[in-house]
């Protein structure tokens, strides 16, 4: 039940109820299947000692959660970690703060959920107080934090009064990294806000979603139309068939805060384009609301224009390039150096596309227009500004679309990449890059690694820095002549192999540097997943669940891997130690 985030209680738990809640129903099932258990449970147990009361259920959940947390803190073992935090309201409008810790154990990066805290105020001081309370409860220290990762909200990221600054006052080594995945999303949003035509395009996409997805009937029409067209192309042999192919599609609504949502929406629009146009025609002809008819007519005109097809394919390509980066950034074990490398690669791809991608893009656009009977433009004709047709522009359509549209959007996208990912050029990451095992440790630089120790004064004293200087020379010679270190893809693999070869014992100071690089956060995707679990546990039907019970349920639902390792004996021991009981939990 905890593993599946299932509810415990039932709406009606009386004897006449047909379903008395999952917890009691499960006990009934076990009782019916096991005669020994049946003799000592529910009605066959003393009335004051049945061990099924709501308070008992909460205590059992609390014990499971405590055993999960115990495992996590044993893995951390008083070592350094990074702090990932975000806040969101639950179904009952309570502000809940998720706390995730990122740490290294046995050379492997772990991101673990350690608590859901109800905060009555979301200012930085309140959030810090809540974090300190949680840390004291679990015997953690702010001094052990070596990285901070939050979203871009003002109450989190403010230079002077944000949570980042408050923690930095107490611990100068708790370096802040703005969520890379969130920054990537902001790159897309920023261009949409700054470029008039791109902004207009996404505004029209939103209007299209409102019209096409406004009712179940219209959504069904899109699916049915798509199904018919798939059957046609299968019949003509134009597409392959097989398991997982040609599945039912539907349009997805994009959102500024949902990573990758714009890309999925545009991709689906290309796949479902004729079906979407059919629905718009239906709305215009059949709908009794004149406003909806006008809106559908305007959307038809816009999306069947060359301009809209141009921006559809341009933004689809840009988002397609960044989608791989977005997916990679959301991995729990992603390390900061690999993330920086991926950001640089993505930026280079965009720069290359700006240099030689226009002709290829134009071919795709022309093919799409021909397939869907959309009028194209002669690229060699003089461009006519639709806003002022009498004014002569003296430029061709090709010049307009290549230089004033394509190049402008690409330049803005590339510029936003540089502005948003300013951490990439920071001295801290430049020094950390010297740890990279790529190409036989070609970036190895002892001076940068010695400089890196100065960023962490609490982790290296003067004697250790002197020792490290000599240790680095032996380390690089050793790993460059060891085949096991020859083809490593990043510092995550380097940490794992150092543990496997026990070189972390031979070069403990180098391994300490490596851990500091690995714990630095990349993205807050794990935090977002915790909020998703919270919404499963505390739903509209379970909106009165108390904070402690919610916290225990969410911990178990998120950390399924650890929950599977918790034994019944551990839980029973914890249960008996909580308070004096009339009887033991057997």
Task: List each model region and its residues.
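Alpha-helical structural modules in large enzymes and assemblies
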Residues: 1-586
